[in-house]
Amino acid sequence: MNIVVVGLSHKTASVDIREKVAFAPTQMEKPLRALLAIEDIAEAVIVSTCNRVEVYISTRDIAGGMARIKRFLADYHGISPEILEPHLYAHHGEAAIRHVFRVASSLDSMVVGEPQILGQIKTAYGYAAEFKTSGIILNRFLHKAFSVAKRVRTETKIASSAVSVSFAAVELARKIFGNLSDKTVMLIGAGEMCELAAKHFINNGVRGVMVTNRTYERAVKLAEEFEGKPVSFDDLFDQLHKADIVLSSTGATQFIIKPKDVEEVIRRRKLKPMFFIDIAVPRDIDPKVNDVENVYLYDMDDLQGVVASNLQQRAEEAKKAEAIIDEEIGQFHKWLSNLEVTPTIVALRSKFEETRKAELEKTLASWKDLPPDGAKRLEALTTAIVNKLLHPPTATLKRVGQGGRTDLYVDALRTLFELQTGESEAEELGELEE
């Protein structure tokens, strides 16, 4: 049995293509059952996020499985195969295992190290388990992917540093103030960057958030998201002294905060330190503000420097993660190969043993003058012959199993000797390997 992965991601398809092939998370039963109804697809899992759509299957027919998934994606979403095909990638065997392990470990994410993708794959697996479209192979495969991702997070620092400007701003604030639990943040602007920064500050336990914007309604809307306080733009400097951290990102063409403004604010704060973060381009805050006593000002260049340094650190950590994945691929591939090989070896030996016993019984029944130890000696002789005959094919199967190329040998033996290997044998092996 083979694992096949077909999909597309932010690396291969624009958002307008990705949204056309996305699956609604609350309506996964229909597509999952449709996949299982397709010829030669034994198990199926669908992962659908804003940045990727992937289908994982187990099948005996690699090329056919890939083609059928591609056709399924096009037909199910009503997209021309000619339009969809250029954006799709397809993997099988070790490449498929590596791909999913990397995805689960966030090495293939838009932001390397982000934690969301692992939860999204777990959710996808949950749907497959609920609707019984995953079985022994994909169950084991995805549980292994989860454990690999955990190892990567535990044994590397891939998720420990900021790689977005908004998160870098929070990281700098923590370096200056340490604990943020008694700090209040003022957001000047209500755009995407301010919203992201607000989320990071809230996640780091700030005491409160104030939001101001030239359009007061937008300030109210963003403040409501974080149980914050909206501030009229006209009241900015009346309220600014209440903020320990000020993050500004507006579309202004001139400075909106100048040194004289901040000097007055600091006096009202009785010289308590303030941290200003200017992520606007053009800048919102006059650089000379940094000269005011007990004021710390950082702009986009400062933050980009933090991000660049952290990206380099993550690149180094990613190398360690790849080494972990290499190690885990070998272990899983061995299990997958043995899943095919072991039941076949058991069935082959059982077939030979049944034949040996049947023929030996016939011989013993018709042998009139059998010596006293004759039956014992014939038992040993026939057993030795069977073992010698079976040693070469058994050794070969085990060897090719370690190399990962088992299907041709397994299929040949099953056909030549008319072997029957039940699903229970495979399940038993799976349980023993857990």
Curated annotation (Swiss-Prot):
In this UniProt entry, which residues are annotated as the site Important for activity? 99
Mind telling me which CDD domains this protein's record contains?
NAD_bind_Glutamyl_tRNA_reduct
**Annotated pathway, please?**
Porphyrin-containing compound metabolism; protoporphyrin-IX biosynthesis; 5-aminolevulinate from L-glutamyl-tRNA(Glu): step 1/2
Picking any one GO biological process from the record gives: protoporphyrinogen IX biosynthetic process from glutamate
Report residues binding NADP(+). Answer: 189-194
User: Anything else the record notes?
Assistant: During catalysis, the active site Cys acts as a nucleophile attacking the alpha-carbonyl group of tRNA-bound glutamate with the formation of a thioester intermediate between enzyme and glutamate, and the concomitant release of tRNA(Glu). The thioester intermediate is finally reduced by direct hydride transfer from NADPH, to form the product GSA.
Give a short account of what the protein does. Catalyzes the NADPH-dependent reduction of glutamyl-tRNA(Glu) to glutamate 1-semialdehyde (GSA).
Q: Any notes on this protein's domains?
A: Possesses an unusual extended V-shaped dimeric structure with each monomer consisting of three distinct domains arranged along a curved 'spinal' alpha-helix. The N-terminal catalytic domain specifically recognizes the glutamate moiety of the substrate. The second domain is the NADPH-binding domain, and the third C-terminal domain is responsible for dimerization.
The protein depicted here goes by the name: Glutamyl-tRNA reductase
Q: Which organism is it from?
A: Geobacter metallireducens (strain ATCC 53774 / DSM 7210 / GS-15)
Lineage of source species: Bacteria, Pseudomonadati, Thermodesulfobacteriota, Desulfuromonadia, Geobacterales
Could you tell me the gene encoding this protein? hemA
